[in-house]
């Protein structure tokens, strides 16, 4: 009973270990693709974000370098009334190595709302007498500037969204007729046709000759008719003679046991028995707990 209990316990432990192992393997097979897909999605998103950030940083640095390399000719209007000469004017110095003009102006904005009329200003003081002009009335035409070389191409921008699906194409031209194929197999027979029209009536036959009547042979017997109704019951018969005696019946059940009889007379004396064995003295061995005899046997 103890061995069977141990076998059942070991069997339960083995089945439990196999079941947990199967569940663990199935869980790994299910969760590993999901984790890999999620990590791949995060990696792709981070790569797109880093690419976009790098592109934005490059655009900002290009704008900063472009602003640094712009000429100072746009400050002419601010220094028009100063005594100092206009700085950075490539047209005055006569050199056109770095006089790249700015790009064309952008499109005109929408006109603003008309402002409110201002108050009339106070009359100004009489001005000082003017000085004679020191420069000729006609401005000196500056030499034309050399066209600047085309800059290097900028970094590729981020991929744009997919375009709209195009319009469906026009249907193609009809194909040419193929060559006639080989004749097909013989078809199944068609349905039966409609019955034909009745034929024309035939000519009248030859009249029969009159002969004396001859009686024919008797026909075969007909089938048996249905069974008739049952007749009325007859008169009761006379009593028969007595039969032979029947066989002997089975034995009856056993009766109650009788009372014990008187004791019998004592029997004669039996034959004398065989002589007994020689007596021995047993010795006890304390090594294995056995009892040995002088004749060397162990009983």
Swiss-Prot record:
GO terms for biological process: collagen and cuticulin-based cuticle development. The keyword Disulfide bond applies. Residues 129-162, 182-195, 215-233, 265-274 have a biased composition (Pro residues). GO terms for molecular function: structural constituent of cuticle. Keywords: Collagen, Cuticle, Disulfide bond, Repeat. SMART domains: Col_cuticle_N (SM01088). Residues 164-181, 251-263 have a biased composition (Low complexity). Residues 105-282 are annotated as: Disordered. Residues 216-278 are annotated as: Triple-helical region. InterPro entries: Col_cuticle_N, Collagen. The keyword rRNA processing does not apply. Nematode cuticles are composed largely of collagen-like proteins. The cuticle functions both as an exoskeleton and as a barrier to protect the worm from its environment. Belongs to the cuticular collagen family. This is Cuticle collagen 34. It comes from Caenorhabditis elegans.
């Amino acid at each position: 009973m103890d061995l069977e209990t141990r076998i059942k316990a070991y069997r339960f432990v083995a089945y439990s270990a196999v079941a947990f192992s199967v569940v663990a393997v199935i869980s790994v097979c299910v969760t590993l693709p999901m984790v890999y897909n999620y990590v791949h999605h995060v990696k792709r998103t981070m790569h797109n974000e880093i690419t976009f950030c790098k592109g934005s940083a490059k655009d900002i640095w290009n704008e900063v370098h472009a602003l640094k390399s712009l000429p100072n000719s746009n400050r002419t209007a601010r220094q028009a009334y100063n005594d100092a000469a206009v700085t950075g004017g490539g047209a005055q110095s006569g050199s056109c190595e770095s006089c790249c003009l700015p790009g064309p102006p952008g499109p005109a904005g929408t006109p603003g709302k008309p402002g409110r009329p201002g108050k009339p200003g106070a009359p100004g003081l009489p001005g000082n007498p003017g000085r004679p002009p020191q420069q000729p009335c006609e401005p000196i035409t500056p030499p034309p500037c050399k066209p600047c070389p085309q800059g290097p191409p900028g970094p590729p921008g981020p991929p744009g969204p997919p375009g709209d699906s195009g319009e469906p194409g026009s249907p193609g031209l009809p194909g040419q007729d193929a060559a006639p194929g080989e004749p097909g197999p013989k078809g199944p027979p068609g349905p039966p046709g409609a019955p034909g029209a009745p034929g024309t009536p035939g000519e009248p036959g030859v009249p029969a000759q009159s002969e004396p009547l001859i009686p024919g042979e008797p026909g075969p017997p007909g089938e048996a008719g249905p069974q008739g109704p049952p007749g009325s019951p007859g008169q009761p018969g006379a009593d028969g003679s007595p039969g032979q005696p029947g066989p002997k019946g089975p034995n009856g059940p056993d009766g109650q046991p009788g009372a014990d009889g008187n004791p019998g007379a004592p029997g004669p004396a039996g034959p004398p028995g065989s002589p007994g064995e020689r007596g021995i003295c047993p010795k006890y061995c304390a090594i294995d707990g056995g009892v040995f005899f002088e004749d060397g046997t162990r009983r």
